[in-house]
């Protein structure tokens, strides 16, 4: 008879162990690393949200840390908002004072943003390991109150999670931090090869952003595009959208003038997220961008291209 059979536990006993002792491995991790981490004058930064939100938040945080002279480590988590590791989208970052890595299984227990889905377990680790922590829900209110992020970060040993551009940054920094992988870059170049002497970019967001739907109706985009075509007969349109219906409508109206992805938008797969990067960086290469209201994707495309 095996030990497992001889000493098998009843269901109530197993449940008692889980509830009372399951935290022990986490505590071991905490105390094994506390001395090492607490001696480091740095910031642990977690970018949150979708692709564009993460990009601008990372640029803001890195600029802040360079300003105050604190090292920065960033951990990239996969979740419902962006289900892809950093290394599957972009080249490794080579910037002084910044280390970015994809999250490990242990990071999900210790460094992820505390929330209902993880039973707020990471908060225990973060309270013990960091001098202070600011989570994404507090960033915008603090900025409106003119919170001194520099003084807060300068002391080091802090944790920050954000999806906003809470600190000003040079738009050129985006191009240094986020370099698309070669296969993604080839797609961007292929779209640009189809540009005319006057190519405009259009980003129409429809599926999950109510403000964009209400404030940026399709009629406004059509009016703007029609004006461009009337003023320049060589006008072409690069369209980035998450709506297949919009693609069909624009193809019907503008025919060969329209350049757009044939694949359906999907941010839940790595291939789909790569497609989003292609759209963003191709928009950045157009002469002018007509974007959607309150869309960080439109804003980032404009910042990347200086449009």
Label every PLM stretch briefly.
Residues 47-56, 209-215:
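A short, glycine/small-residue-rich beta-strand->loop->alpha-helix junction that serves as a flexible
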Residues 50-52, 77-82, 165-166, 205-209, ...:
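Short, solvent-exposed loop/turn segments at secondary-structure junctions
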Residues 55-66, 221-222:
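Histidine-anchored nucleotide/phosphate-binding helix
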Residues 235-307:
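Donor-binding and catalytic core of enzymes assembling or modifying cell-surface/extracellular glycoconjugates
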